[in-house]
Amino acid sequence: MSTGTPFLSTADIAHILQWRGLGPCLRGLMEALRADFMRWEDFDKSARVAHHSPVGVIELMPISDGRTYAFKYVNGHPGNTALGLSTVMAFGGLASVTTGEPQLISELTLCTALRTAATSVLAASVLARPDSRCMALIGNGAQSEF
């Protein structure tokens, strides 16, 4: 019997970052990403499902490795700043493929920013020249303006 689906909030993630430290967290994310990229073929990758409207977009991004099923819901609404809201917000879920039982619900706005940073470092470690000392990033995600 389930004891309830855990929810990971922005405050929970901030607490983990303070407790563990940003560097160790990013290194852990980078290694998890590296491990997942090494098993790329194991994932059933589906195209994102998008709903476009005059005021923004809402996207659903599903993926599964046959053991777990995950999704990310993310929006992009440029006019939200006039309402005192973020222009980009995200959350997601993780479930068992075997039982369908939800295993985790999480905010993913902050998580996506952390994932982007870890992916950038991972890509640079693989693609940069060995003598490189700096890197420039041009982004078009939550940190950018519409």
Features from the language model and the residues they span:
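Charged, low-complexity, helix-prone segments enriched in Lys/Glu/Asp/Gln
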Residues: L114-R115, S144
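N-terminal ligand-binding/catalytic initiation module
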Residues: M1-A113, T119-V121, A128-D131
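Glycine-rich adenosine-cofactor-binding loop
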Residues: S120, D131-F146
